[in-house]
Amino acid sequence: MAKRDYYEVLGLSKGASKEEIKRAYKKLSKKYHPDINKEADAEDKFKEIAEAYEVLSDDQKKAQYDQFGHAGMGQGAGFGGQDFGGFGGFEDIFSSFFGGGARRDPNAPRQGNDLQYQMNVTFEEAVFGAEKEISVKKEVECDTCDGSGAQPGTNIKTCSTCGGRGNVHVEQNTPFGRVRSERTCPDCGGTGKEFEEKCSDCGGTGRKVKTVKISVKVPAGVDTGQQIRLSGQGEPGINGGPAGDLYVVFNVQDHAYFDRSGEDIFYTLELSIAQAALGDEVEVPTLEGKVKLTIPAGTQTGKRFRLKEKGVQNVHGYGRGDEYVTVKVMTPVKMTNRQAELLREFAEIDGHDITEQPSNFFDKTKRFFKGE
């Protein structure tokens, strides 16, 4: 199978800058990373993107590729025999030079580009689900020319330079001698079309950039990094092809007092020394409101209670997580004289001879002037 053009893989033109190449690689590699994208061909696309970037990000390799195409990546082209994998055999090299193999019809329908949108949602929206409206800046079909690229009332002709093929034959000297290869037509840009007059609104592209409002249903239980696909909400297709898709990636904001890990949530319960020592019945917050929790006498800091199925529901509907309540016993910082006196009595009964210490500089100063 003939390899795709590296610039095409990254969605770029041949004159793309280093920054454009890097930006395209970061966007596409994130989109097709096998850990994020679970589609069957995601891994193959990810490898193809990485291979294209490896060549186009290196000045020497890029220059060789720009001159000789995929054939320039072989061992005879000065790369020290580096194996890029999947480049095919000797037939593929000559196929790329002499125009063998399948050619893409410039007028064939092609699917539009996919888009990605980073969406912030509150903790509650992620837990319970929500419906929100987002504004996406994207290319849409030009409504003046209906996507044709031609000024209304004018004709579209077959490109006189390439005869509608979208490519032209070029002869050049290579390590294999003088060969004939194919290049994108410089006059029609590969479309195979020639406009009598380009659309005054879109300049002949058939597209315009607009900010479009799209309704998004946030699934209950969604977490940071998870995404949904909105079919057909990407960029418009080419030559009547289907539109691309829009991938919405969620970022869940922090909650005031709940932490989350997967479907489980965590809450820190502060107790006084008396509550922890004597036990108590307290109210703790859950996702649906407050519930009563019994604290046994002698509870220590770090003690964890489990509230079964009080966590977040699984985003796919497979059950629900738990809520974990962790105790933190709070030592009093400011006490009345009576409170301090009772603690001294407790220490004495408990058999502890305590050497009291001031809590801060002002207490030290106060005790100094009192002669303590």
Swiss-Prot record:
Signal peptide: none annotated. Gene3D superfamilies: DnaJ domain, Heat shock protein DnaJ, cysteine-rich domain, Urease metallochaperone UreE, N-terminal domain. Keywords: Chaperone, Cytoplasm, DNA replication, Metal-binding, Repeat, Stress response, Zinc, Zinc-finger. Its cofactor is Zn(2+). Binds 2 Zn(2+) ions per monomer. Residues 5-69 form the J domain. InterPro entries: DnaJ, DnaJ_C, DnaJ_domain, DnaJ_domain_CS, HSP40/DnaJ_pept-bd, HSP_DnaJ_Cys-rich_dom, HSP_DnaJ_Cys-rich_dom_sf, J_dom_sf. Zn(2+) 1 binds at residues 142, 145, 199, 202. One of its GO terms (cellular component) is cytoplasm. GO terms for molecular function: ATP binding; heat shock protein binding; unfolded protein binding; zinc ion binding. GO terms for biological process: chaperone cofactor-dependent protein refolding; DNA replication; protein refolding; response to heat. It comes from the Bacteria. CXXCXGXG motif repeats lie at residues 142-149, 159-166, 185-192, 199-206. It is found in: Cytoplasm. Participates actively in the response to hyperosmotic and heat shock by preventing the aggregation of stress-denatured proteins and by disaggregating proteins, also in an autonomous, DnaK-independent fashion. Unfolded proteins bind initially to DnaJ; upon interaction with the DnaJ-bound protein, DnaK hydrolyzes its bound ATP, resulting in the formation of a stable complex. GrpE releases ADP from DnaK; ATP binding to DnaK triggers the release of the substrate protein, thus completing the reaction cycle. Homodimer. The J domain is necessary and sufficient to stimulate DnaK ATPase activity. Zinc center 1 plays an important role in the autonomous, DnaK-independent chaperone activity of DnaJ. Zinc center 2 is essential for interaction with DnaK and for DnaJ activity. Belongs to the DnaJ family. This is Chaperone protein DnaJ. The gene is dnaJ.
